[in-house]
Amino acid sequence: MNKMTNNKTIWMKPRYVKKKWYVIDASDKVLGRIATEAIKILRGKHKPYYTPHQDLGDNVVIINASKVKLTGKKYFQKIYYRHSRYPGGLYSDTYRTLSERKPTAPLEIAIKGMLPKGPLGRELFRNLKVFADANHKLSSQNLYKLEAN
Protein backbone atom coordinates (compact mmCIF):
# COMPACT_ATOMS: atom_id res chain seq x y z
CA MET A 1 0.00 0.00 0.00
CA ASN A 2 1.16 3.48 -0.76
CA LYS A 3 0.86 5.75 2.26
CA MET A 4 1.70 8.91 0.28
CA THR A 5 -1.94 9.76 -0.40
CA ASN A 6 -2.25 12.13 2.58
CA ASN A 7 0.51 14.49 1.42
CA LYS A 8 -1.15 17.66 0.20
CA THR A 9 0.38 20.89 -1.00
CA ILE A 10 -0.85 23.89 0.95
CA TRP A 11 -1.94 26.88 -1.13
CA MET A 12 -2.78 30.14 0.59
CA LYS A 13 -5.32 32.25 -1.21
CA PRO A 14 -3.95 35.75 -1.87
CA ARG A 15 -7.04 37.44 -0.45
CA TYR A 16 -6.23 35.99 3.00
CA VAL A 17 -2.63 37.21 3.01
CA LYS A 18 -2.23 40.63 4.62
CA LYS A 19 1.14 42.21 3.82
CA LYS A 20 2.80 44.35 6.48
CA TRP A 21 5.58 46.89 6.01
CA TYR A 22 8.74 46.44 8.09
CA VAL A 23 11.53 49.01 8.38
CA ILE A 24 15.14 48.05 9.18
CA ASP A 25 17.74 50.64 10.17
CA ALA A 26 21.05 49.47 8.69
CA SER A 27 23.32 52.05 10.32
CA ASP A 28 26.39 50.42 11.94
CA LYS A 29 25.10 46.89 11.23
CA VAL A 30 26.90 44.15 9.27
CA LEU A 31 25.75 43.87 5.65
CA GLY A 32 25.13 40.10 5.64
CA ARG A 33 23.15 40.15 8.88
CA ILE A 34 20.86 42.86 7.54
CA ALA A 35 20.41 40.90 4.31
CA THR A 36 19.42 37.67 6.07
CA GLU A 37 16.89 39.45 8.29
CA ALA A 38 15.37 41.08 5.21
CA ILE A 39 15.22 37.72 3.40
CA LYS A 40 13.31 36.07 6.24
CA ILE A 41 10.66 38.77 6.07
CA LEU A 42 10.53 38.89 2.24
CA ARG A 43 10.11 35.12 1.93
CA GLY A 44 7.55 34.94 4.75
CA LYS A 45 9.50 32.46 6.88
CA HIS A 46 8.37 34.26 10.02
CA LYS A 47 4.74 33.29 9.35
CA PRO A 48 3.16 29.99 10.37
CA TYR A 49 1.72 29.37 6.90
CA TYR A 50 5.02 29.70 4.98
CA THR A 51 5.17 27.85 1.68
CA PRO A 52 8.28 28.09 -0.52
CA HIS A 53 6.43 28.37 -3.84
CA GLN A 54 4.26 31.42 -3.04
CA ASP A 55 4.80 35.10 -2.27
CA LEU A 56 3.50 35.16 1.31
CA GLY A 57 6.14 37.50 2.72
CA ASP A 58 5.90 41.10 3.77
CA ASN A 59 7.39 44.30 2.41
CA VAL A 60 10.74 45.51 3.73
CA VAL A 61 12.10 49.07 3.81
CA ILE A 62 15.81 49.43 4.62
CA ILE A 63 17.05 52.88 5.61
CA ASN A 64 20.61 54.18 6.10
CA ALA A 65 22.06 51.65 3.64
CA SER A 66 25.09 53.87 3.08
CA LYS A 67 26.11 53.42 6.75
CA VAL A 68 26.26 49.61 6.65
CA LYS A 69 29.46 47.94 7.93
CA LEU A 70 31.64 45.19 6.51
CA THR A 71 33.88 42.85 8.48
CA GLY A 72 37.57 42.40 7.81
CA LYS A 73 39.19 44.05 4.80
CA LYS A 74 36.19 43.66 2.52
CA TYR A 75 35.80 47.43 2.18
CA PHE A 76 38.90 47.46 -0.04
CA GLN A 77 39.08 43.83 -1.25
CA LYS A 78 35.50 42.76 -2.04
CA ILE A 79 35.00 42.80 -5.83
CA TYR A 80 31.66 42.93 -7.65
CA TYR A 81 31.60 41.67 -11.24
CA ARG A 82 29.16 42.43 -14.05
CA HIS A 83 29.24 41.70 -17.76
CA SER A 84 27.87 43.60 -20.75
CA ARG A 85 27.38 40.33 -22.72
CA TYR A 86 29.80 41.54 -25.37
CA PRO A 87 33.23 39.93 -25.85
CA GLY A 88 35.66 41.43 -23.37
CA GLY A 89 32.83 43.22 -21.55
CA LEU A 90 33.70 42.17 -17.99
CA TYR A 91 33.57 45.03 -15.50
CA SER A 92 34.69 44.89 -11.90
CA ASP A 93 34.17 47.28 -9.00
CA THR A 94 35.40 47.15 -5.44
CA TYR A 95 32.95 47.70 -2.62
CA ARG A 96 34.41 51.14 -2.05
CA THR A 97 33.89 52.40 -5.60
CA LEU A 98 30.46 50.79 -5.93
CA SER A 99 29.19 52.24 -2.65
CA GLU A 100 30.47 55.70 -3.59
CA ARG A 101 28.68 55.55 -6.94
CA LYS A 102 25.46 53.92 -5.73
CA PRO A 103 25.22 53.50 -1.93
CA THR A 104 22.28 51.08 -2.01
CA ALA A 105 23.76 48.66 -4.57
CA PRO A 106 25.85 46.37 -2.28
CA LEU A 107 22.88 45.67 -0.03
CA GLU A 108 20.56 45.10 -2.99
CA ILE A 109 23.07 42.73 -4.63
CA ALA A 110 23.46 40.75 -1.39
CA ILE A 111 19.70 40.37 -0.94
CA LYS A 112 19.09 39.54 -4.60
CA GLY A 113 21.71 36.78 -4.41
CA MET A 114 19.89 35.17 -1.48
CA LEU A 115 16.49 35.14 -3.18
CA PRO A 116 15.34 32.23 -5.36
CA LYS A 117 16.25 32.51 -9.00
CA GLY A 118 13.30 32.81 -11.38
CA PRO A 119 9.94 34.58 -11.49
CA LEU A 120 9.22 34.19 -7.76
CA GLY A 121 12.55 35.74 -6.80
CA ARG A 122 11.95 38.71 -9.08
CA GLU A 123 8.49 39.18 -7.57
CA LEU A 124 9.89 39.03 -4.03
CA PHE A 125 12.62 41.55 -4.89
CA ARG A 126 9.94 44.07 -5.83
CA ASN A 127 8.78 43.97 -2.19
CA LEU A 128 12.10 45.48 -1.08
CA LYS A 129 12.84 49.21 -0.90
CA VAL A 130 16.36 50.37 0.00
CA PHE A 131 17.24 53.99 0.82
CA ALA A 132 20.72 55.44 1.33
CA ASP A 133 19.65 57.67 4.22
CA ALA A 134 16.76 57.98 6.67
CA ASN A 135 14.59 60.00 4.27
CA HIS A 136 12.05 57.89 2.43
CA LYS A 137 8.69 58.43 0.78
CA LEU A 138 6.91 55.49 2.43
CA SER A 139 5.95 57.17 5.69
CA SER A 140 2.26 56.86 4.78
CA GLN A 141 2.53 53.08 5.22
CA ASN A 142 2.10 51.59 8.68
CA LEU A 143 5.78 50.73 9.28
CA TYR A 144 6.78 48.21 11.95
CA LYS A 145 10.32 48.69 13.26
CA LEU A 146 12.44 45.55 13.08
CA GLU A 147 15.63 45.25 15.12
CA ALA A 148 18.37 43.36 13.31
CA ASN A 149 21.56 42.22 15.04
Swiss-Prot record:
GO cellular component annotations of the record: cytosolic large ribosomal subunit
Xref: CDD domains: Ribosomal_L13
Keywords: Ribonucleoprotein, Ribosomal protein
Domain of life of the organism encoding this protein: Bacteria
Pfam families named in the record: Ribosomal_L13 (PF00572)
One GO term of the biological process aspect: negative regulation of translation
Any GO molecular function: mRNA binding
Subunit structure: Part of the 50S ribosomal subunit.
Function comment: This protein is one of the early assembly proteins of the 50S ribosomal subunit, although it is not seen to bind rRNA by itself. It is important during the early stages of 50S assembly.
Similarity annotation: Belongs to the universal ribosomal protein uL13 family.
Name the record gives this protein: Large ribosomal subunit protein uL13
Source species taxonomy: Bacteria, Pseudomonadati, Spirochaetota, Spirochaetia, Spirochaetales
